[in-house]
């Protein structure tokens, strides 16, 4: 019985991956908005209902890998060692190279470049991305509130979560911009993500009180 369940679960994972891979290929070839779910189902040799059983929306076919990111991010903050701050745990996780930036796979770099261009050209995908990160921010805020025993109505957990996720979103935008260039230098991009991300986090640690204050001459 256990063996049958194992085979069944593997079959489900294989089907899910097949659908995701098929969708990604078609989206890159034709553009996200030009590919209906029916075409994905036909290419993957499954029904439309099966596609939606695995992916609630067409947009989720693009962002399906982000579920694991959310789980791992929250775990990194929640399970941080004693004495480590929330911002330090967040930075340690977010600034760690992953995917293409860690492996340097040329095929992965091409896929990431193509996906970045596809997302940038699709209002539907950009809107879905905003929804996903809003959910992440809410989850992080809830974790921070619980971790700090914040009272109901305390805005600091939400403000902190928005600030931290703002750094992450800014780094994503930075990487996407770098991928639009002629030559993609993985080592340089990874180093800049770490350095620029740490700069942004350091700013949050120091506080915004004097950031951008003008001097007597009017300069910053």
Briefly describe each language-model feature range.
Residues 134-160, 181, 212:
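Hydrophobic alpha-helical bundle segments that form small-molecule/ligand-binding pockets
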């Amino acid at each position: 019985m256990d063996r049958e369940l194992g085979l069944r679960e593997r079959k489900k994972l294989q089907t899910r991956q097949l659908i995701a891979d098929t969708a990604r290929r078609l989206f890159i070839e034709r553009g996200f908005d030009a590919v209906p779910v029916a075409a994905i189902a036909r290419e993957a040799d499954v029904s439309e209902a099966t596609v939606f059983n695995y992916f609630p929306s067409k947009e989720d076919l693009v962002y399906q890998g982000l579920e694991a990111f959310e789980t791992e991010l929250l775990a990194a903050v929640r399970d941080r060692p004693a004495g480590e701050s929330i911002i330090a745990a967040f930075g340690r996780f977010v600034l760690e190279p992953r995917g293409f930036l860690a492996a340097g796979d040329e095929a992965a770099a091409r896929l990431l470049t193509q996906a970045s261009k596809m997302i940038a050209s699709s209002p539907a995908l950009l809107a879905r991305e905003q929804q996903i990160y809003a959910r992440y921010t809410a989850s992080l805020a809830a974790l921070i509130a619980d971790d700090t025993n914040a009272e109901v109505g305390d805005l600091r957990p939400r403000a902190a979560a928005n600030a931290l996720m703002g750094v992450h979103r800014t780094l994503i935008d930075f990487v996407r911009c770098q991928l639009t260039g002629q030559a993609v230098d993985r080592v340089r991009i990874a180093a800049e993500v770490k350095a620029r991300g740490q700069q942004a986090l350091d700013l949050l640690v120091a506080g915004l009180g004097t950031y951008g204050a003008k001097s007597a001459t009017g300069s910053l």
